[in-house]
Amino acid sequence: QLCLLQPLGSGGFGSVYKATYHGATVAVKQVKKSSKNRLASRQSFWAELNVAWLQHDNVVRVVAASTCAPASQNSLGTIIMEYVGNITLHHVIYGTGDVWRQGEDDEGGCGRLALSMEETVCYSCDIMTGLAFLHSQGIVHLDLKPANVFITEQGVCKIGDFGCSQKLEEGLSQSLHVCQQGGTYTHRAPELLKGERVTA
């Protein structure tokens, strides 16, 4: 029922593949067992599932997940998500990967077109709408950066890669809301850099 087609990318905690699941095109993330930090690998897998029950136009949807995997795969589990393509905001901003918008830009003439004002506003609204929804559900992403914002063929931004996310539970001690996981240092919220409480 699940057939891997081609690799889309890999990161610190696993690899992502384009695949089919019951005939539908999906993305599959296999979270690998880390020999160096098994706890962090496990936390990343379960953090991805913080959004498993959510549905929103600007959040990558989880279709299914499983902790069953052949021993040969060295995998903690598999997460099946909607396929939104392989273009990220990072590709669009920096002209990398499959996206290279040819033309003369306004700054330096390096051959890459700057985002139009309309695109910038639309993308920003999509991201803010997705974040507002996540925060209304008590979920903080903790690794939001251009590489984790996917752009569909229809030009809709979807927030993905929830491996560092946390679900904030009301009534829990504030000390429990301190970030225990990584995330990209250069994109961290100021309160995390100061060692303060995570907030939505």
Curated annotation (Swiss-Prot):
Might you give the EC number(s) for this enzyme?
Answer: 2.7.11.1
Key word Nucleotide-binding present: yes
Which residues constitute the signal peptide according to the record? none
Q: What is this protein called?
A: Serine/threonine-protein kinase mos
* Example of a GO MF term: protein serine kinase activity
Q: Does the keyword Kinase apply?
A: yes
Give me the disulphide-bonded residues. Answer: none
Query: Which gene is annotated as encoding this protein in its UniProt record?
Result: MOS
Give the organism the record lists: Nycticorax nycticorax
Query: InterPro entries attached here?
Result: Kinase-like_dom_sf (IPR011009), Prot_kinase_dom (IPR000719), Protein_kinase_ATP_BS (IPR017441), Ser/Thr_kinase_AS (IPR008271), Ser/Thr_Kinases-Pseudokinases (IPR051681)
Catalytic activity reads:
L-seryl-[protein] + ATP = O-phospho-L-seryl-[protein] + ADP + H(+); L-threonyl-[protein] + ATP = O-phospho-L-threonyl-[protein] + ADP + H(+)
Which family is it part of?
Answer: Belongs to the protein kinase superfamily. Ser/Thr protein kinase family.
What PROSITE patterns does the record point to? Answer: PROTEIN_KINASE_ATP (PS00107), PROTEIN_KINASE_DOM (PS50011), PROTEIN_KINASE_ST (PS00108)
Q: Where does ATP bind?
A: 8-16, 29
Report the residue ranges that make up the Protein kinase domain in this protein. 2-200
Enzyme class of the recorded protein, top EC level: transferase
Q: Which Gene3D superfamilies match?
A: Phosphorylase Kinase, domain 1, Transferase(Phosphotransferase) domain 1
Tell me the classification of the organism that encodes this protein: Eukaryota, Metazoa, Chordata, Craniata, Vertebrata
Q: Which UniProt keywords apply?
A: ATP-binding, Kinase, Nucleotide-binding, Serine/threonine-protein kinase, Transferase
**Active-site positions, per UniProt?**
143 (proton acceptor)
